[in-house]
Each structure stands twice: as C-alpha cells, then as structure tokens.
Amino acid sequence: MIRLTAVLFQATRRWWYEWTAVLPLALVWFVCQLLVLPGPPATAVLYALMRQSSDNQWWNGRDAWQAAKTLFWPAWKWALVNGLVVGLVVFNLLAYWDVPGAVWTLLRVVWLLVLTIWLGLNLVYWPFWLAQTDKSLRNTYANCGRFLLLNPLSGLGVTAVSALVLFVSIFTILPFVLGSMAWVALVGVTAVQHSLLTRDT
C-alpha cells in the first residue's frame, strides 16, 4: 500500500521546485479549458509533462506540442466517457436532491460515492495510460480500479485532498489557481509511481 503523506510530500516538493516552469504550462492549460476543444488534450499533456518532471527529465514547448499531437484523440475518448459518467451522476444528484425519504437519501449517498470513486479513478488515469503498453480505455480503467482496491484509504485520501485543493484554489490568487492543477497531476503521477514500486518490491 502507498503512504498518503509520502505521496503528497514528494508531489508538493516537486511542484514547488518546478514552479517557474509549471506556471506558464498551467496558464496554457487554463486557456485550453476555456476553448473547450483543446481542453482534454491539454489535461493529458499536463500529466505527461508532470510525469517527466517527476522523473527529473526536462521538457520544453516542443515536448508539449509533440505530446499534444500524440494524445489528442486518446484524450477525447477519455473525455467523452468522463462526460457521460459525470453527467449521469450529476443529473441524478440534482434531479433527486430534494426528494424526501430514506431510500432517496441512500441513493444520493450512493451517487456521491460513485462520483468520488470515479474522480479517484481519473486522478490516476493518465499516469497509468502513460506507463502501460496496452493503452485501451478498458485496460487503463482496470488498472485504475486495481489501484483503488489495493490502496482504498490512501487512494480516497489522495482524491479528497486533491479535490479540496482545487476547490480552495478557486477562491485564492490566480497563480495558485493555475498551479493547483499541475499539483494534482503530480499527485496522481506520484501515487501511481509509488504503487508500481510497491508492487515490484
């Protein structure tokens, strides 16, 4: 099992060390989300470059562009699945949020749990996709699921902390808002690396 504190400490240390490089990258990522079409590929590229940073490998704009071309269609496949699942869960939560009754309360709890697990899977989706040979959606999500099964508390802990950081960053200064997504990517990358090292030892 991975150690939550070790993952967060290592990711935060790397994020701080790479701050000057991360900020322009995060700004480009933010703009891409506003433009929609390049949004999912930009997220995949962010993970890919943070993986290189975690491995002490330098990267530049050419690396980012090459990654964007490689990851464009895989990223959109991932985004479409995400949109379907998250849309379904959010619709059910909003549509039945005020419906009274114990059964409906239980269903809302189930939907919230499903959403949390799904976010946990996607936190580590790209680190697994980048690390494995079989890059299909099915195989990647299977590996993400195994990760959460093998590290249930740490996995949910990493997910909760990442979600909290993103939420808090929305109400803080712009540089932290931009840099927080890079930090989340580093957390996902670091968690997967720790998991793979634990498996191999």
Write out the residue ranges for each language-model feature.
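Hydrophobic alpha-helical membrane segments
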Residues: 1-201
